[in-house]
UniProtKB/Swiss-Prot annotation:
Keywords: DNA-binding, Host cell membrane, Host endoplasmic reticulum, Host membrane, Host microsome, Membrane, Phosphoprotein, Transport, Viral movement protein
Transmembrane segments: none
GO CC terms of this entry: host cell endoplasmic reticulum membrane; host cell plasma membrane; membrane
Recorded family membership: Belongs to the begomovirus movement protein BC1 family.
Summary of the function given for this chain in its UniProt record: Transports viral genome to neighboring plant cells directly through plasmosdesmata, without any budding. The movement protein allows efficient cell to cell propagation, by bypassing the host cell wall barrier. Begomovirus genome is shuttled out of nucleus by Nuclear shuttle protein (NSP) and the movement protein transports the DNA-NSP complex to cell plasmodesmata and facilitates further movement across the cell wall.
Post-translational modification: Phosphorylated.
Subunit structure, as described in the record: Binds to dimeric supercoiled plasmid DNA.
Protein name per Swiss-Prot or TrEMBL: Movement protein BC1
Membrane topology: Peripheral membrane protein
GO MF annotation list: DNA binding
Length: 298
């Protein structure tokens, strides 16, 4: 950031000297001049913030008559990540003299470093890399305010100074404002995995059973505190309709015993000899019945 001798808040522009730049395929910065350190501290003591009202980029080519290529000028906000720092971009032919006017849409604090960065690069050019191809001059118009306010987007202004080119030869891109999305902090009573009834699953604590925790109509909370648990379990005046399974864990084991399991019960399996006798008896009865039917037919 170079020193600037003028006042911070006025109708004048903070101008840089017209500098020559070399052709490159990589992004290179264009010099910007912001208020001096003393002027920044003066505005900071006044408790104000600042914004760039207007930025002007004056491009004057220094290339041969038949030079080809596209110049890309990008305005970046260094307060954002590198992938999302680009705020606007211009593209125009390398031989086209043009003035680019861009209007800012955000405030910045003087406690931060210079928020803006303007870079350029050249693509698809027949000019040799490293050649001094243009003079570029940047101008900024700044203003201060007690606090930030909403700024409406204002489209850029493009002044083409070369007669062989029209506005169709210049393109402009600007970043879009993200749509506001509300983020919920705590879900309400009608949200979450149990939106209809509002009931929550029973959470058992150490020393508790499902029978002691089961109740009817308790939708606000299914958890007993350490102070409330003894009174609920031992209070004989509590309604049995509210806690129908309260004393279930106190029943004797015999009342809840379903009996022996299949593996413990006596096996009724038949021996191989018994099965063979049943089969032989069945076959004999079938043969006798068939012979009786034949004799009756004769």
């Amino acid at each position: 950031m170079e020193n600037y001798s003028g006042a911070v808040v006025n109708n004048k522009y903070v101008e840089t000297k017209s500098c020559e730049y070399r052709l490159t395929n990589n992004e290179m910065p264009i010099k910007l001049q912001f208020p001096s350190y003393l002027e920044q501290k003066t505005v900071q003591i006044m408790g104000k913030c600042m914004k760039v009202d207007h930025a002007v980029i004056e491009y004057r080519n220094q290339v041969p008559f038949n030079a080809k290529g596209t110049v890309i000028v990008t305005i970046r906000d260094t307060r954002l990540s590198y992938e999302q720092a680009a705020q606007a971009a211009f593209t125009f032919p390398i031989a086209c003299n043009v003035d680019l006017h861009y209007f800012s849409s955000s405030f910045f604090s003087l406690k931060d470093e210079t928020p803006w960065e303007i870079v350029y690069k050249v693509e698809d050019s027949n000019v040799i890399d490293g050649t001094t191809f243009a003079q570029i001059k940047a101008k900024l118009k700044l203003s201060s305010a007690k606090h930030s306010t909403d700024i409406r987007f204002k489209p850029p202004t493009i002044n083409i100074l070369s007669k062989d080119y029209t506005e169709e030869c210049v393109d402009f891109w600007s970043v879009e404002k993200p749509k506001p999305i509300r983020r919920m902090l705590n879900p309400g009573p009608n949200q979450g995995p149990y939106p209809i009834s509002g009931h929550r699953p029973i959470m058992l604590q150490p020393g508790e059973t499902w029978a002691t925790r089961s109740s009817i109509g308790r939708s606000s909370s299914m958890r007993y505190t350490n102070n409330d648990r003894p009174s609920i379990l031992d209070n004989t005046s509590a309604s049995d309709a509210d806690y129908p399974l309260r004393h279930l864990h106190k029943l004797p084991e015999a009342s809840l015993d379903p009996g022996d399991s299949v593996s413990q019960s006596h096996s009724n399996a038949m021996s191989k000899r018994e099965i063979e006798d049943i089969i032989e008896t069945t076959i004999s009865k079938c043969l006798i019945s068939q012979r009786s039917n034949v004799n009756k037919a004769l």
